[in-house]
Structures are given as C-alpha cells and as structure tokens.
Amino acid sequence: MKVVLRFKKRGMRRFLSTLESIKLVERSLRRADFPLVFTEGFHPKPKMSFLDAMPVGVVNLAFYVEIHLKDLSRKHLENLERTLPKDFPLAGAWICEENINKVVTSYRFKLITPYCMDLLSRKVEKKGKKISFGESVVDFEVFRAKEYSIFRYTQRRERLMNPLLLVEKDSFFVAICEEALTESGEDLSSFLERRGTRVKKSASG
C-alpha cells in the first residue's frame, strides 16, 4: 500500500538540510517499527519519495512524504508520534495511490517581516540569471500591521525562489511554506481527503 504522511518542519528543525530531514524521517519510521517496503538490489532502501526541498531556514508546514508499506495501523502512527521531535510533528496520514509529485504544481508561502518593502520589484539570481520576483508569483497579498508586514504568495514548482533571498541581510523575518497545491489551487491535504483514506486527522498550526 502507498501512504502519504505530512510533517511540519518548524522551530530549530527548519535549519536541517534536506538530507538531514530525510534521514530524520527514515530513522523515525524505523524506530516506530513501520513495515517498510524496500527497493531491490545490493543496497535496499525504503521506497519513499518527497516533494520539493525547501531552503534551510524556511518553516515547512507541507513536508509531505510518500511511502510504500506492507500494512498500516494506528499503533504504527502512535509509535511514530512518540518518536518524532516536537518541532517535527506528524500532521496527517492518508492511504492514497495518487502520485503526489504528479499532483502538486505549486506552493503557498508566507513571509513575515518587521517592515514594509516592495517585494514584487525584487530580483533574485537563479541559475546565473536575474529573475524578477513579481514575474514568478501566481498571486500576491500584503497585510500590514503596526509592527510587521505579512506577505502571502503562491509560486509554481518550476519557478520556485528562495524566500530568504527577498529580504535585507541580517534583518528579522520568518519564511513559511504553508501548503502544497494542485493544478486547481486545492490544498494537497484537501485533495488527499477526497482521493484517499484518512488514517490520522490533519493537525492545524
């Protein structure tokens, strides 16, 4: 069976590299005695796949993992929840045969800063070229308060930019990947609710 797990990578865990995050997931699954399905060959590995890696330092609330299992019970999930660190919790689990890497087309981000700035005119270097941030977003919203500003936007997978490069160096900010989205703009968690079987309720926060 194929199962999709959603984790929330936050707190100090947001500073883990992609490889360290993958190792954390694999190690936690083994400790929780998940009945993993392995690849064939001389060096078998758990059959699992991940969505796009987010830059180190970005809070990732959409850390989805697709794994192949022999079976799954609530006991496995309870074991996993006890094994995981508090700043890398399990937020949802679904039995679903859909390939999430074929379903997801974009991501929704939130950027919180203590000041106002013109993000849309910012240019970021990507693969040796200066690319305008405004040209890479599908939608863009700004919410201003007395002491901070919240920028919310969506970017397609093929045009992802490191949100940490959008703010001034040494300034305070929080960059968050809120959710992965389908072609229609539906949250991946909602898509999994419709097309799969929920094993664990999706957590908020």
Predicted regions and their residues:
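Ordered, amphipathic secondary-structure segments that act as subunit-interaction surfaces
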Residues: N60-K110
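Short beta-strand-to-loop capping motifs
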Residues: F7-K9, E66-L72, L111-Y115, F151-R157
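Core RNA-modification/binding signature centered on pseudouridine synthases
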Residues: S121-G205
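Short, charge-patterned binding micro-sites
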Residues: V37-I67
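Ordered, soluble secondary-structure elements with a strong preference for glycine-centered loop motifs
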Residues: R14-L19, D71-R74, M161
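Extreme N-terminal starter segment of soluble prokaryotic enzymes
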Residues: M1-V3
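N-terminal ordered "arm"
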Residues: R13-F38
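A short, aromatic/hydrophobic, helix- or strand-capping loop or linear motif
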Residues: L36-H43, A91-I95, F133
